[in-house]
């Protein structure tokens, strides 16, 4: 069954436009509350299910939180409120507090005028599809407020940042520290603004924190993991050893070397995997996505680490890790999942695993990545006016096959429809920049031509 509201990462959209409205969040809170009440938690007779609400630093977070809280309370579910808190912190606290669910009001790396929501199960992982469908079914029913004696209580959680800081530090070996390193931390004016710098500082680093002054509007604005040039400049300006950039909700990370070179999720996962293999603690292989650079796949093959590709989206990376019983997965955008450390992608914890590899080996980024030369990638977004079935179009298929033959084993072609916009993404990867440019343009042109022809034909 197709979901109506939930996408690959919860519900997201523009604030004030359905479904990112107070009215919908009130109904959503009530619907989630009813689903939680219908589950068998084996709670004591006088106990109700409890949900923790976290949010990032967007101005709209408080408005949506109030609506959501009212919905939960009306259904008869207890609520714990926190201040701005990274997404992975909510996932951790749900488990640590032994409560039934968590909700995060955030649109991750999007601008301030967008917002959204995602939920975590009692295990601290994203909700299964079946539960999201149950919630959507419940949304069709009107709100019937629980009797006053059964209304949910609302309390504010204390020292949530402190608990999470200690959890992050616990994933770094006790016998090591970050002394002697100068690290610039870009908090993206987001949910990590009171956390990321403190973690690095308490582990001994000399920390320069930037973009840790959220005003409700500046989240992700020319800063953080989606605008890495700012961090590159700051690392060079401060003469730092490294830079760490998270995104607005703290679930992804990119890093920068002292020379100002950017290392994406693919590179960071490679460093972590190689270090774990050397220490004999890499369990299984590594999961990447359809966007993972072919050079990384080939490098894993050379050093004997199994590698598998999932669809784009941290949910799919997580699912494939569980299926294979592997522990390390990543997207090039910086979502890195270390399943032995946390249930979900965590920017700070992932950065700490990389810093552990650097500290433990005494090597730097360039040393650990010397055996990987990234293949050039050319990405073209082709705008289409209506649903065009490119997968079953003969001309597109012929053009793609020709390109695949020309590129051979040292190239890759990926065509995929955007999940949010009327676009088809064409990605061609190979060793020769001119060759991939030629084929990317040719395939994109063919798709454009066929899409127009199919519109005219209708």
From Swiss-Prot:
Keyword terms: Isomerase, Magnesium, Metal-binding, Phosphoprotein
Give an example GO molecular function. Answer: phosphomannomutase activity
Query: Which GO cellular component does the record give, naming just one?
Result: cytosol
Modification after translation, per record: Activated by phosphorylation.
Q: Which residues form the active site?
A: 108
Reaction equations catalysed: alpha-D-glucosamine 1-phosphate = D-glucosamine 6-phosphate
Quick check: keyword Metal-binding in the entry?
yes
Q: Name the EC number(s).
A: 5.4.2.10
The positions annotated for binding Mg(2+) are: 108, 247, 249, 251
Q: Which cofactor does it need?
A: Mg(2+)
Q: How is the cofactor bound?
A: Binds 1 Mg(2+) ion per subunit.
Among the record's GO biological process terms, what is one? UDP-N-acetylglucosamine biosynthetic process
Which residues are reported to carry the modification Phosphoserine?
Answer: 108
InterPro entries, alphabetized: A-D-PHexomutase_a/b/a-I, A-D-PHexomutase_a/b/a-I/II/III, A-D-PHexomutase_a/b/a-II, A-D-PHexomutase_a/b/a-III, A-D-PHexomutase_C, A-D-PHexomutase_C_sf, Alpha-D-phosphohexomutase_SF, GlmM_bact
The protein's matches in Gene3D superfamilies, at most eight in alphabetical order, are given as: Alpha-D-Glucose-1,6-Bisphosphate, subunit A, domain 3 (3.40.120.10), Alpha-D-phosphohexomutase, C-terminal domain (3.30.310.50)
| UniProt-listed PANTHER family | PHOSPHOGLUCOMUTASE (ALPHA-D-GLUCOSE-1,6-BISPHOSPHATE-DEPENDENT) (PTHR42946:SF1), PHOSPHOHEXOSE MUTASE (PTHR42946)
What is this protein's function per UniProt? Catalyzes the conversion of glucosamine-6-phosphate to glucosamine-1-phosphate.
* Protein name from the UniProt record: Phosphoglucosamine mutase
């Amino acid at each position: 069954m197709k979901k109506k509201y939930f996408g690959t990462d919860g519900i997201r959209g523009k604030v004030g436009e359905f479904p990112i409205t107070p009215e919908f969040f009130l109904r959503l809170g009530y619907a989630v509350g009813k689903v939680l009440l219908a589950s068998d938690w084996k709670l004591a007779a006088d106990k109700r299910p409890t949900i923790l609400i976290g949010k990032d630093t967007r101005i709209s977070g408080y408005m949506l939180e109030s609506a959501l809280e009212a919905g939960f309370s009306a259904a008869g579910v207890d609520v714990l409120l926190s201040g701005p808190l990274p997404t992975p912190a909510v996932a951790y606290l749900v488990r640590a507090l032994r409560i039934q669910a968590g909700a995060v009001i955030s649109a991750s790396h999007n601008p301030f005028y967008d917002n959204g929501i995602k939920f975590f199960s009692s295990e601290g992982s994203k909700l299964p599809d079946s539960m999201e469908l149950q919630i959507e079914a419940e949304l069709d029913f009107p709100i019937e407020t629980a009797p006053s004696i059964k209304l949910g209580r609302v309390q504010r959680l204390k020292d949530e940042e402190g608990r999470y800081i200690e959890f992050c530090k616990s994933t770094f070996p006790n016998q090591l520290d970050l002394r002697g390193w100068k690290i610039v931390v870009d908090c993206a004016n987001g949910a990590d603004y009171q956390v990321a710098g403190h973690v690095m500082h308490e582990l001994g680093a000399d920390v320069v924190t930037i973009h840790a002054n959220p005003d409700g509007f500046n989240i992700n604005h020319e800063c953080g993991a989606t605008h890495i040039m700012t961090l590159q400049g700051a690392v060079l300006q401060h003469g730092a050893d490294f830079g760490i950039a998270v995104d607005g909700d703290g679930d992804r990370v990119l890093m920068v070397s002292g020379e100002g070179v950017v290392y994406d999720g693919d590179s960071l996962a490679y460093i972590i995997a190689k270090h774990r293999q050397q220490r004999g603690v890499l369990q299984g292989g590594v999961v990447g996505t359809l966007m993972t650079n072919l050079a990384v796949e080939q490098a894993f093959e050379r050093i004997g680490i199994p590698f598998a590709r999932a669809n784009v989206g941290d949910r799919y990376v997580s699912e494939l890790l569980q299926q294979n019983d592997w522990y390390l997965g990543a997207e090039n955008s910086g979502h890195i999942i270390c399943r032995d450390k946390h249930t979900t992608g965590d920017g700070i914890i992932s950065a700490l695993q990389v810093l552990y590899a650097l500290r433990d080996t005494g090597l730097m980024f360039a040393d650990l990545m010397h055996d990987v030369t990234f293949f050039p990638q050319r990405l073209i977004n082709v705008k289409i006016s209506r649903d065009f079935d490119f997968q079953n179009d003969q001309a597109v298929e012929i053009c793609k096959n020709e390109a695949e033959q020309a590129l051979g084993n040292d190239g890759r072609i990926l065509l995929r429809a955007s999940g949010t916009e009327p676009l088809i993404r064409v990605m061609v990867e190979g060793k020769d920049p001119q060759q991939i440019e030629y084929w990317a343009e040719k395939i994109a042109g063919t798709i454009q031509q066929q899409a127009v022809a199919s519109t005219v034909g209708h």
